[in-house]
């Protein structure tokens, strides 16, 4: 039987393909306080108008598809569609611009970073009309933030648990990252903690391999921590990596860490996924466990200036999903990181209210609605000569993590830890006395080295080591 369309059915619907900009480019739209706002860096294919490319991003990341569909008549399209409300040309870039898109809150499941990212970045990055696309920033409305738990504990609760105030915390990643037996691994942990560090850490790819099963590592590390605490009188910790093939196995490892009375565990939030991370974060709050987050795989998404997802977006997503620490780069070490950009997303992790500041890459004012902050972790190619700059750049609410800068000390692990602790204490004292760490940092370290042979040896070993490469991710 042939289908015949009535006259009434023809009204308001016409099959076919039409330009995205006719529906999704809405320069007269005023964003609502409840909208999620996105800033995309768009590079369209040659010949594609800016308005059409921007509207295509809005459509494909919300309600649109490539052709008109009659089921649009069964919903309120104007209520649910993403709206490109502004286009901002980029100086010096002929075929690149920033597209500002507003998404109605009802498009997203409450408390789900997974669903939010699936919608906003899940499909549109493969769109043929675009040569490249990068999500630069998101504005998360308070109405949506209130559906998330956020970090298990936050900065202040962590300090109260550790009874450590007025300075950054010191950490160390155990090296070599792979190949040590569990017993030798525990020995290295003990030596570093006894020497003066607050934390030691599993590297991101230590899970449960043939040379070192997770349960054995946990047992030897727990023994090392209890011994170091008894000798130093300080609370110590080790980031036990509970990242696992399944969520069930992840929680099993977390439970065992709790049985051993460990204060903190660790998770690789990108490789494991946001669903697993949010699950673990909620478990940590319920069980009084701090959660350290490693960002393994982040540079796959955020390193290229024109395509991917900027780390400030990943940082916001992590704060929502939950974590008490996250690696942020160092500015001065071996890993990529422009100072202004890095401090921009460090503030987005730690502060409660951050104003728009394009000089630091912050496209939107962000109110975190009293959600606890996340402690920044500076890690990657740092040593004692970097200490003054690190303290000046990151302030107190950070973990300064020296892997090779501890274990590479010529006298061994414990002296390496002592050298870092002495350098940190000297910088904190100098700062509190009003000295300029950036201008006088070298003198401060040399003065401390006169009475600390461990620091003197470290200074001599690493005096020529620098990582001077131009940052790729700039404003």
Curated annotation (Swiss-Prot):
One GO cellular component, as annotated: carboxysome
Purpose: RuBisCO catalyzes two reactions: the carboxylation of D-ribulose 1,5-bisphosphate, the primary event in carbon dioxide fixation, as well as the oxidative fragmentation of the pentose substrate in the photorespiration process. Both reactions occur simultaneously and in competition at the same active site.
Origin organism lineage: Bacteria, Bacillati, Cyanobacteriota, Cyanophyceae, Acaryochloridales
Modification N6-carboxylysine occurs at: 201
Underlying gene: cbbL
Predominant localisation class: other
Protein's recorded name: Ribulose bisphosphate carboxylase large chain
Record localization: Carboxysome; Cytoplasm
Binding site for substrate: 123, 173, 177, 295, 327, 379
Record note on quaternary structure: Heterohexadecamer of 8 large chains and 8 small chains; disulfide-linked. The disulfide link is formed within the large subunit homodimers. Interacts with assembly factor Raf1 which helps form the holoenzyme, most interaction (and folding) occurs in the cytoplasm.
Note: RuBisCO folding and assembly commences when the nascent large subunit folds with the help of chaperonin GroEL-GroES. Both RbcX and Raf1 help folded RbcL release from the chaperonin and dimerize. Dimeric Raf1 binds to RbcL(2) leading to an RbcL8-Raf1(8) complex. RbcS displaces Raf1, resulting in holoenzyme formation. The basic functional RuBisCO is composed of a large chain homodimer in a 'head-to-tail' conformation. In form I RuBisCO this homodimer is arranged in a barrel-like tetramer with the small subunits forming a tetrameric 'cap' on each end of the 'barrel'.
Signal peptide: none
Reactions performed catalytically: 2 (2R)-3-phosphoglycerate + 2 H(+) = D-ribulose 1,5-bisphosphate + CO2 + H2O; D-ribulose 1,5-bisphosphate + O2 = 2-phosphoglycolate + (2R)-3-phosphoglycerate + 2 H(+)
Native source organism of the sequence: Thermosynechococcus vestitus (strain NIES-2133 / IAM M-273 / BP-1)
Family according to the record: Belongs to the RuBisCO large chain family. Type I subfamily.
Domain of life: Bacteria
Site (Transition state stabilizer): 334
PROSITE patterns the record matches: RUBISCO_LARGE
Entries under CDD domains matching the protein: RuBisCO_large_I
Sequence positions that bind Mg(2+): 201, 203-204
Main EC class the enzyme belongs to: lyase
